[in-house]
């Protein structure tokens, strides 16, 4: 039986199960096993069954572009300029939090620690600290912080009520027990301190729904519920400053749970959105397979080497027709996925006649409209 990590109550029938034996992770890698997703209608929270040995996975196997502190995920392209995710995260953080001299900030679930490194460069009077559940990134941390400013596995005892701000960038979707983690963060903050958190918005970036290693898919309602349960007053939940994500800011007001009443209209909207998302993914694999049959034997490519493109690859019965993946992220060019080369769009071979577009459906049409070359050479395009 699967238990809701936020309420402690049993979750009943799944709203989604992947059809094949392979699932996709948030790093666009494959995972042997099914993705099983549940929905708690009481608080509007989507929860995925944990992968096996999840603690070991994050300690030893979850390698978030850890070769260097420069590797990153492409966030968006504006007027031809590539903007990367961690760059955008720092700029958004600075627009939301007023960092004063000698403030102390901890990044909880920091991975490479790049956000705090960049924050320290822009705000050298702010003291930065790091915590993660792995030691894989220590070689990067020690390049810019002394050893008493970072910790792995457990936070330091001397950090009790030390921090003015605790941040968490795309970590709380991974943790099996977010209530436990946020209560621990409560003990690390000074009274009145702020928790600044970014998590995926599954209703804007629907690909988050099917990744095997994201245990939690929050809504506005379930974020407010989580904050209240850990003694935080919700200051803001912003759905627009970071595409496909919630920016949630809470203020520590108590060490105990707070009373919280979910708005019934907001909850009804979340229920409808969750059902629509589940229906979409429950039918998508059949759509991909039908398209594959209709273009069988033609040379094809998958546009997008991220979650959506990887999902397409796991659905195909035969990858022989796939010649390559196309992606705009220059950090991926020259690498491979599913034993296929990842190339820039400018190098698309003219013999490619079929393209599977592995992008967020909300932006896919707009992105592809900027590729006039496709109209000349490509005969069949699948949008998810």
Stretches found by the model and what they are:
Residues 1-165, 169, 182, 246, ...:
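Conserved N-terminal segment of class I S-adenosyl-L-methionine
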Residues 130, 174, 197:
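Conserved SAM-binding loop
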Residues 169-176:
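Short catalytic micro-motifs in class I SAM-dependent methyltransferases
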Residues 251-384:
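Hydrophobic, well-ordered beta-alpha structural blocks that scaffold small-molecule cofactor pockets
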Residues 19-21, 196-226:
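Short, glycine-/aromatic-enriched active-site segment of Class I SAM-dependent methyltransferases
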Residues 125-126, 193, 375-379:
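A short helix->loop->beta-strand "cap" motif at the edges of active sites that frequently abuts
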Residues 179-194:
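A short glycine-rich, Lys/Arg-flanked "PGG" loop and its adjoining helix->strand segment in the class I
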Residues 14-18, 232-243:
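Conserved S-adenosyl-L-methionine
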């Amino acid at each position: 039986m699967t238990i809701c990590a936020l309420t402690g109550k049993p979750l009943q029938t799944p709203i989604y199960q992947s059809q094949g034996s392979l699932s996709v992770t948030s790093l666009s890698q494959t995972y042997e096993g099914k993705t099983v997703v549940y929905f708690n209608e009481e608080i509007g929270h989507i929860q995925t069954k944990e992968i096996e040995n999840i603690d070991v996975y994050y300690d030893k196997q979850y390698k978030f572009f850890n070769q260097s502190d420069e590797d990153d995920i492409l966030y968006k392209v504006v007027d031809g300029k590539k903007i990367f995710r961690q760059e955008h995260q720092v700029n958004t953080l600075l627009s939301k939090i007023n960092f004063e001299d000698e403030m102390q900030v901890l990044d909880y679930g920091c991975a490479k620690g790049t956000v705090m490194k960049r924050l320290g460069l822009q705000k050298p009077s702010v003291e930065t600290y790091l915590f993660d559940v792995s030691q894989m990134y220590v070689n990067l941390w020690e390049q810019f912080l002394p050893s008493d400013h970072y910790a792995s596995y457990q936070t330091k005892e001397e950090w009790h009520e030390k921090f003015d701000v605790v941040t968490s960038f795309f970590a709380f979707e991974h943790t099996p027990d977010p209530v436990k983690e946020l209560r621990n963060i409560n003990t690390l903050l000074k009274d009145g301190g702020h928790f600044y958190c970014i998590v995926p918005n599954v209703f804007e970036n629907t690909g988050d729904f099917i990744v095997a290693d994201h245990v939690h898919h929050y809504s506005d309602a379930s974020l407010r519920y989580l904050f209240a349960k850990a003694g935080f007053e919700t200051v803001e939940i912003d759905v627009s400053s970071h595409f496909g994500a919630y920016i949630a800011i809470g203020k520590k007001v108590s060490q105990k749970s707070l009373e919280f009443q979910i708005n019934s209209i907001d909850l009804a909207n979340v229920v409808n959105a969750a059902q629509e998302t589940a229906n979409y993914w429950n039918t998508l694999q059949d759509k991909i397979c039908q398209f594959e049959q209709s273009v069988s034997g033609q040379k094809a490519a998958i546009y997008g080497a991220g979650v959506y493109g990887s999902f397409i690859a796991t659905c195909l019965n035969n990858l022989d027709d796939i010649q390559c993946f196309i992606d705009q992220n220059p950090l991926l060019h020259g690498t491979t996925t599913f034993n296929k080369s990842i190339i820039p769009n400018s190098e698309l071979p003219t013999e490619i006649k079929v393209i599977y577009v592995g992008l967020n459906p909300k932006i896919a049409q707009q992105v592809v409209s900027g590729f006039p070359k496709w109209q000349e050479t490509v005969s069949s395009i699948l949008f998810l």
